[in-house]
């Protein structure tokens, strides 16, 4: 049985919704139990892991097999009541011990391969995102000890078929699914319920006396604020895709400064007046980049290159190569302008700032000097 945090349902309109776990948790658990089996030389039918969010999962093991220096195990993906394309499929891990002292991670059958730049993984590598890579390697290292080496292969026999129901091909991930998950847990929640829970966090912070708030899309933004800006996480609230809603809630509650911090892939949509940033509502990332590059006098070849990109990261590589890094300060200023336009009928609109950062936590641009923004947030 998993811990109470996981077992507790999410309630929505009087209905209890069951949580699930990510493909990253499945791969981590499968790799851990395979490593344990090859060390102990017997089958194991249940395994527990601690997810990045601190939740303990106790999962049933399927198809366990051990022979000599190699073991294989599978975990069945369970998305809870948030069913997606990978729900119910088996995620396998094959662990082979060696004397290298290193842990190598491979993507096997049904795991997609990265074929384009722009998603934070090297071209040609398996589509296993950073957090699952870390949790897999950590779990295997704990199982085999500090000196042994191991080759870990993650595979999913249904992956090719299941991937056809995802956006992987559009992102240049071919041949299978992605192993993903920053928290390890899938939490089902309707949009309205989700928005209300985010707003509640704003209310709690305002009640505690805070009148300045940092709004971030998700975990990456929170980490950037803490590690790169040295700002107390107490002032940070996740806005997810609900930018306009959370800004309006911050105004309603009387916050006098709002700072939007995030990756351009999300925040540049605000520069186009898009205040719900989920892709099913609107995209316009490349169009926004092209328009503002043109305003800065960028040449047509660069505009063409950017317009043909599928991801913001890919476009950013072209922007950097052509020396148009000043675009990011321009976009940050434009984001603030758009926010103030949205609040033009507000009697006492808050001050607004924006900060853009890259996937490797480097500051790209800001509406004002970053030091001044950080200093005000720590007052």
From Swiss-Prot:
Q: Which domain of life is it from?
A: Bacteria
MF terms from GO for this chain are: cobalt-precorrin-5B C1-methyltransferase activity
According to its UniProt record, in which pathway does this protein act?
A: Cofactor biosynthesis; adenosylcobalamin biosynthesis; cob(II)yrinate a,c-diamide from sirohydrochlorin (anaerobic route): step 6/10
One short Pfam name that applies is CbiD
Q: Name one GO biological process term.
A: methylation
Q: Which reaction does it catalyse?
A: Co-precorrin-5B + S-adenosyl-L-methionine = Co-precorrin-6A + S-adenosyl-L-homocysteine
Q: What class of enzyme is it?
A: transferase
Gene3D superfamilies documented for this protein = CbiD-like (3.30.2110.10)
Keyword Transferase set for record: yes
Keywords, comma-separated and alphabetical: Cobalamin biosynthesis, Methyltransferase, S-adenosyl-L-methionine, Transferase
Which InterPro entries does this chain map to? CbiD, CbiD_sf
Q: Which PANTHER family match?
A: COBALT-PRECORRIN-5B C(1)-METHYLTRANSFERASE
| Similarity-based family | Belongs to the CbiD family.
Q: Which HAMAP family match?
A: CbiD
* Protein name, per record: Cobalt-precorrin-5B C(1)-methyltransferase
Q: Which gene encodes it?
A: cbiD
